[in-house]
A protein has these predicted regions:
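Solvent-exposed N-terminal domain segments of exported/luminal and surface proteins
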Residues: 26-249, 255-257
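Gram-negative outer-membrane assembly/targeting C-terminal domains
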Residues: 432-451
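Gly/Pro-enriched, hydrophobic low-complexity segments
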Residues: 27-53, 81, 94, 222-294, ...
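Hydrophobic helical h-region of N-terminal Sec-dependent signal peptides
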Residues: 10-17
């Protein structure tokens, strides 16, 4: 039997060994791996290029605060994938993409362009990521993260749940503002525009570091809706916590019909709480493809694959693109969408015993360069594909930062879809807006709505 002194010595030795392993991992960043943890090499067939640092400066003619000039506007599609030829490319397609291509309604196709590994981050983010590799750790059975800041916590992941946390913490500035102009698009061709002004203050990404009272707070978020008419003037302010088992999300909301600010019920901000403006097509944990506590799922890594994924979405997100042109029945207009071949981590989340989730199994395709979830295939309890979700990213090269620009949630049961975070007509997000924590909460919400 071990004595207490011996046990302490063993634990200390294990901790020292773990620290040595982490330190060794950190030396691989910028060498065997990119500074953000990706494989820098080209694919065997050369279709995925070697990583050369991404875009770190705006192209000539870019005006700060204005539309992003598409740095790849002269690229032409290499080929198009349709229902007629999808078998030729099936090893590089997701289950969801095959389902979209196979539908009898609509005219879905994927235009595949040259692969451009455009993602880049500021040097201070890479520096923080390297430090995280020596110190970040999972807590509470993987439901939280400690001792990490600014960059992804696990650039060389050792477990599937660490990949989820990398997505959750990918850097896109710490003071965010945008006006979004999404929509619900119906199979009869009609659409309902959803206009929302967003503010977000990210404690985790703050270069000054969070104060102790916000140690478990990832970010503050506030949204005020301007459309559709029945939601005009509605507002919501929320604290998104990191370990949501230890401390659930907290939110307040303003309902213009009652003219009162009230505490948001837990069901409105967690798990499968429906998002009221999405007409049944989106739930709370569908934001950013997955948002919130991972505790109700078992997470499994299915491997790393070369997949055609949405990327470099400059054309679709240009403020000159109209809703009517982009948001066609059954799926967005393929003329505006760009797909490229990239390496992705394939991550599966399956509901744990004891839970009965509508979204019982989810498969995520995770960009190796940015750690952003680019696609999600969502299955019900009968293992039927019910939703397909695609995220479209681009480099905000003025930062630089690879940003989740918008996403599309396809309801595979009826052909409707919801599109969110897109900013048509309003210009790109500001990643360094003048914000501080006092700009959130019930008092701030009251000030914003002017009541």
């Amino acid at each position: 039997m071990f004595s207490r002194k011996t046990s302490i010595a063993i634990l200390a030795a294990m901790a020292a060994l773990t620290t040595q392993v982490w330190a060794a991992d950190a030396t691989l960043l910028g060498d065997k791996f990119t500074s953000n943890g990706a494989d820098p090499s080209a694919s065997a067939d050369g279709m995925i290029p070697a990583y050369s640092g991404g875009i770190t400066n705006p192209p000539e003619g870019y005006v700060a605060g204005g539309d992003h000039i598409d740095p790849f506007r002269n690229d032409k599609p290499l080929f198009s994938i349709t229902a007629a030829n999808m078998e030729q490319y099936e090893n590089r397609l997701s289950v969801g993409q095959k389902a979209l291509l196979s539908r009898k309604k609509g005219n879905y196709r994927m235009d595949v362009y040259p692969s451009r590994r455009s993602c880049a981050l500021p040097q201070f983010v890479y520096d923080a990521t390297k430090k995280n590799a020596t110190r970040a750790r999972l807590i509470d059975d993987g439901n939280g993260v400690a001792d990490a800041r600014i960059g992804v916590p696990f650039p060389i992941p050792k477990s599937p749940i660490e990949i989820y946390w990398n997505h959750n913490f990918h850097w896109h500035g710490h003071r965010y503002h945008a006006v979004t102009s999404g929509a619900n698009v119906y199979n009869n061709g009609s659409l309902t525009k959803i206009v929302r002004e967003d503010w977000r203050y990210n404690f985790y990404a703050d270069p000054q570091g969070p104060i102790s009272q916000h140690a478990n707070d990832q970010f503050n978020w506030m949204g005020i809706w301007k459309a559709p008419p029945r939601f005009n003037g509605s507002g919501f302010s929320m604290i998104n916590t990191i370990n949501q088992l230890a401390e659930p999300r907290k939110g307040v909301m303003f309902n213009p019909s009652t003219r009162r600010i009230m505490q948001a019920p837990a069901a409105a901000v967690t798990y499968e709480g429906p998002l009221s403006t999405a007409d049944g097509m989106r739930q709370s944990h569908d934001m950013f493809l997955f948002s919130g506590s991972p505790d109700r799922y078992n997470w499994r890594l299915l491997g790393k694959r070369e997949i055609f994924v949405p990327y470099n979405a400059y054309k679709a997100s240009a403020s000159t693109t109209t809703h009517e042109a982009l948001m066609t029945p059954f799926h967005p207009n393929p003329d505006y969408l760009r797909y490229e071949l990239h390496r992705v981590w394939v991550l599966e989340a399956t509901q744990k015993d004891g839970f009965r989730m509508k979204q019982a199994r989810r498969v995520f395709y995770v960009d190796e360069d940015s750690w952003i979830f680019l696609m999600s295939d969502i299955f019900n309890n009968r293992d039927e594909l019910i939703y397909v979700q695609h995220a479209f990213i681009k480099n905000y090269y003025e930062a630089p930062a690879c940003v989740f620009e918008f996403d599309v949630m396809h309801d595979m049961t009826n052909g409707n879809y919801n599109i969110d975070h897109i900013k048509l007509g309003f210009g790109p997000a500001d990643l360094d807006y003048d914000l501080d924590p006092s700009d959130f909460g019930s008092s701030a919400l009251r000030r914003k709505i002017g009541r």
